UniProtKB/Swiss-Prot annotation:
The name this protein goes by in its record: Nucleoporin Nup43
Organism lineage: Eukaryota, Metazoa, Chordata, Craniata, Vertebrata
Subcellular locations according to the entry: Chromosome, Centromere, Kinetochore; Nucleus, Nuclear pore complex
Record's keyword terms, sorted: Acetylation, Cell cycle, Cell division, Centromere, Chromosome, Chromosome partition, Kinetochore, Mitosis, mRNA transport, Nuclear pore complex, Nucleus, Protein transport, Repeat, Translocation, Transport, WD repeat
PROSITE patterns: WD_REPEATS_1 (PS00678), WD_REPEATS_2 (PS50082), WD_REPEATS_REGION (PS50294)
PANTHER family the UniProt entry points to: NUCLEOPORIN NUP43
GO BP of this protein: cell division; chromosome segregation; mRNA transport; nucleocytoplasmic transport; protein transport
WD repeats: 8-57, 72-110, 127-166, 170-208, 215-255, 259-299
Pfam families, A to Z: WD40 (PF00400)
Subunit structure: Component of the Nup107-160 subcomplex of the nuclear pore complex (NPC). The Nup107-160 subcomplex includes NUP160, NUP133, NUP107, NUP98, NUP85, NUP43, NUP37, SEH1 and SEC13.
A cellular component term, taken from the record's GO annotations: kinetochore
Organism field: Homo sapiens (Human)
N-acetylmethionine: modified positions: M1
SUPFAM superfamilies: WD40 repeat-like
Length: 380
């Protein structure tokens, strides 16, 4: 892998996301967005990675990500998702959800739409109104789903002023993250270790399914769905463990993998190469997990060298559906094959790595050390 380039940006980065490429595009990712937190003024920023890796006049590598534009954001940026190539949805610690529009002609960002009281502990009409942080957002054009510390789930549509659907008491605990399973179904994770599946076709405020690790109430902070196999999801939480779940099978994780030494803040399957998975943590580490079957012959081990991990435990999930033509490598339960190569991607640990995103050969991450790291050659 080529060097991973750092840029110090004088703000703690809470979220970063690559701008999606047009369908069928052969380009590599060039533009990413960041959101900041815990600063006197927080910003949503757009960056270009430009002519990366060109030799500069001193013969060194130039890895300076260029700031295209930014805009002030009220409150900490709790989550960030591209809605399409021009619009970015931001979740705020104030409970507000904002859609920002990028104007490429003059490189500016403007507020396109806003739901100011999406999340709250006591209602906007109450004299004791108190907002609640919006903790997570997921987009599937034209829909935007948000979750919050108030245990509320909102379904918004772009260009609609009001929520299309709200599940007021979806959870008695904090909802930390949300992802789409299939179009009408979402999956949430909460602060008592539960995964809940919600079907927007059903009326009422009850989840269609609840999964959790028996006896374990460790808060879950992040979730991602396998891009090709929608029943496979990965979660991470306060104990740093990586859990792989098959939502068709029982209520327990299929695999539990010992991972980081502190909270896992984000987990992402690679969108086009999902045998590769990436995690980041409060402990200052950023890891690449490789579950591809050809690990011994792999030609692309990273500089720091990998370390192997074995599955800690399995539930009996290999009895049903084995006739599937493709069984995800993440669901393999053959002990002889249970080897996963883990590689640390950052040269040294510092403060918390809060966020990461991967697209094609490109990875970006952001830290509390006020740094953004980018590489364009993940697999070479």
């Amino acid at each position: 892998m080529e060097e991973i380039y750092a840029k110090f940006v004088s703000q703690k980065i809470s979220k970063t996301r690559w701008r999606p490429l047009p369908p069928g595009s052969l380009q590599t990712a060039e533009t990413f967005a960041t959101g900041s937190w815990d600063n006197e003024e927080n910003y949503i920023s757009l960056w270009s990675i430009g002519d990366f890796g060109n030799l500069d006049s001193d013969g060194g590598f130039e890895g300076d990500h260029q700031l295209l534009c930014d805009i002030r954001h009220h409150g900490d940026v709790m989550d960030l998702q591209f809605f399409d190539q021009e619009r970015i949805v931001a979740a705020s610690s104030t409970g507000c959800v904002t859609v920002f529009l990028h104007h490429p002609n003059n490189q500016t960002l403007s507020v396109n739409q806003q739901w100011t009281t999406a999340h709250y502990h006591t209602g906007p009409g109450s004299p004791s109104y108190s907002s609640a942080p919006c903790t997570g957002v997921v987009c599937n054009n034209p829909e935007i789903v948000t979750v919050g510390e108030d245990g509320r789930i909102n379904l918004f549509r772009a260009d609609h002023k009001e929520a299309v659907r709200t599940i007021d008491n979806a959870d008695s605990s904090t909802l930390h993250a949300v992802t789409f399973l299939r179009t009408p179904e979402i999956l949430t994770v909460n602060s008592i270790g539960q995964l809940k599946i919600w079907d927007f076709r059903q009326q009422g405020n009850e989840p269609s399914q609840i999964l959790s690790l028996t006896g374990d109430r460790v808060p879950l902070h992040c979730v991602d769905r396998h891009p090709n196999q929608q029943h496979v999801v990965a979660t991470g939480g306060q104990d740093g463990m990586l859990s792989i779940w098959d939502v068709r099978q029982g209520t327990m994780p299929v695999s539990l993998l010992k991972a980081h030494e502190a909270e896992m803040w984000e987990v992402h399957f690679h969108p086009s190469n999902p045998e590769h998975l990436f995690t980041c943590s409060e402990d200052g580490s950023l890891w690449h997990w490789d579950a591809s079957t050809d690990v011994p012959e792999k030609s692309s081990l990273f500089h720091q060298g990998g370390r192997s991990s074995t599955f800690l435990s399995h539930s009996i999930s290999n009895q049903a559906n084995v006739h599937q033509s493709v069984i995800s490598s993440w669901l393999s339960t053959d002990p002889a094959k249970d080897r996963i190569e883990i590689t640390s991607l950052l040269p040294s640990r510092s403060l918390s790595v809060n966020t990461l995103d991967v697209l094609g050969p490109c990875l970006v991450c952001g830290t509390d050390a006020e740094a953004i790291y980018v590489t364009r050659h993940l697999f070479s």
